[in-house]
Amino acid sequence: MTAKYGVPQQSDGVACDPSFIIVGYGKLGGLEMGYKSDLDLVFLDDAPDQLATDGEKSIDNAVFFTRVAQRIIHLLTTFTSAGQLYEVDMRLRPSGSSGLLVTSLDGFKRYQDKQAWTWEHQALMRARVITGSVRVEREFKRLRDEILSKPREADELREQVLEMRGKITEVFSTNKREEEVLKTTFGLKYDAGGIVDIEFIVQYAVLRWSQNHPELLQYSDNIRVLEVLEQLELFSAQDAEWLREAYKALRSAIHRLTLEQLPSRLSMVEVEQRGLNEYREAVIRIWTQTFKPDELC
């Protein structure tokens, strides 16, 4: 790209450094990649859009970084004799599928401050820089910490998180299936007591308490955040341990089922046989306790 177009320029005429980062969200950002996991990516740059590259075939900085992003996606989604390398999901970028492929750092901040929904801040908890400019990475981390730790009204946050969880339940859970199916099966990821409940508990805790406990912003993965919640005595040692072990057990079960090309929905008999029911019940108990209005402090 630079051989063809030159290097993007800063406002002072100095070449960028390259002022571009790739941010991983979801399982990639949370260091929890599994078999068949896709890549949730967001591309950010910090070069003036009104300026251009310094090559003979000069193009606008914004166009340059968009083409870089397109090239990266093309390489990551390459098909080989063994199948596709990865699936790439860009929907977590500002404004989702209708947004720019590459967002400026200033634009990212404005969006998160003025337009982003609470669920987008939940997603940001699992975001980390994968590669790119060290300078822009530092600025992104600063923005992430600032956004996640902004003051929030406890009851409003609780209702927004519960509302989003309810929407996920409507789409993915057995709650819309026949009553008999609901009673006799358990979806390891989306049903009550599953992985999403644990993730939402952790995300809620970060948004709720990080203003006063910046230690919660150190990590993007659920396990280490739960360890910090225990250290800060925001969660009891017993509850934090239950959630960590439940998360690991459920993720491990999904990995095995994926390798066997089986769905991540088990009969309750299988759930008992795999030793997962005690984790399911513990997660439901902690979820209920966490989201009780009178439990907020």
Predicted region positions:
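A nucleotide- and high-energy phosphate-metabolite-utilizing enzyme signature
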Residues: 1-297
